Structure formats: C-alpha cells, structure tokens
Design a protein with these regions (language model features):
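Single conserved hydrophobic/aromatic residue that forms the stacking wall/gate
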Residues: 1-8, 12-13
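Beta-propeller fold detector
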Residues: 9, 61-73, 135-144
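Beta-rich, blade/repeat-based domains predominating
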Residues: 10, 14-31, 81-92
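Hydrophobic core segments of beta-strands in well-ordered, beta-rich domains
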Residues: 22-41, 91, 98-107
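Short loop/turn segments immediately following beta-strands, especially the blade-tip
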Residues: 51-64, 127-134
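Peripheral, solvent-exposed domain-edge segments
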Residues: 121-122, 128-155
Length: 155
C-alpha cells in the first residue's frame, strides 16, 4: 500500500499495474535505508528495478519519509541480451568485503514467444558511490566472466 501511494502513475505506465518483489537493503551509508522493487509487469518490455530511500531514523511507516528514485536503477540492456531484469536481492562475498546483486532476466525480449519460460538467475557485483549508496551498474551479458567474490576459497 505504501508503494502504491508513492509511485502513483508508475502503476499504470504502459498498461502494467504491478510493483512487486520488494527487498529491504541497508547500504554502507547507515543513515539511509533502501527498498528495491521490480516495477511494471514481467511480461512487458518495461520490467525493471526501482528504488525507494528514506532516512534510517525516519518513521518508515509514513509514506512521506520515502523518496522514489525518478528513473529505474536497473533496466534492460538489449545490446547485452538482457531483458526484463528484476527480482533483485543482495548477498555479500564470503569475507563481507564485496556486495553482489542476485536477480533474474531473459536473453530474449519479454514480449517474444517463449519469453516467460526463459528467465535465468544472474549475479553481478555492485559498487558504491561517494555517499555509500549502491550503484547497480549495467546488466552484463549472460556468461560474461567475472572475478571470484572476495574471500572465495581457491580452487
């Protein structure tokens, strides 16, 4: 209900009335809290990740405490064959020095035949801005090599 009152017209953009999969996240900046959520319908080309932030000491039950990021913070990247990224959650590296976003996406457009059966899980390292807030980056192409997470056992 709080997200509905915050996003208003986002609920109706492009005939999709869905905001789902909220994930509460404490950034490095302990003065803030975040809620990442998936916006738009997963069957549309516009499925993406949105962000709400609030001061950590605010009344988090008051919709006025929350600020909505004006644009999606993570969205499709057709040139990387990433469509409909959403369902984000966050995990730390084994030693806690790095943070990764776990999400799902498709290699084909969401409105293509067979798209609804083609989601795959993805893992991508996030960075931090100068204020300690997360930067999710650009969705990487499936199968792109990445460095082992910090603290991973050597094999």
């Amino acid at each position: 209900e709080m997200l509905r009152s915050l996003v208003g017209s986002e609920m109706c953009i492009r005939d999709s009335h869905v905001n789902e999969a909220p994930h509460f996240f404490q950034p490095k900046n302990k003065d803030k809290v975040c809620i990442f959520y998936s916006a738009s319908g997963s069957w549309t080309p516009y499925y993406c990740v949105g962000l709400l932030t609030a001061d950590a000491n605010a009344n988090l039950l008051d919709p006025a405490s929350w600020k909505k990021h004006p644009t999606p913070v993570f969205q499709q990247k057709p040139e990387n064959e990433v469509f409909g990224p959403g369902g984000s959650s966050f995990v730390s590296s084994p030693d806690g020095k790095e943070c990764y976003m776990l999400y799902h996406a498709r290699q084909i457009p969401n409105d293509a035949p067979g798209a609804m059966d083609s989601r795959t899980p993805r893992l991508q390292k996030i960075e931090w801005d100068k204020d300690g807030m997360p930067i999710l980056g650009i969705p990487q192409k499936e199968g792109e090599p990445m460095a082992k997470p910090s603290g991973s056992p050597i094999n």
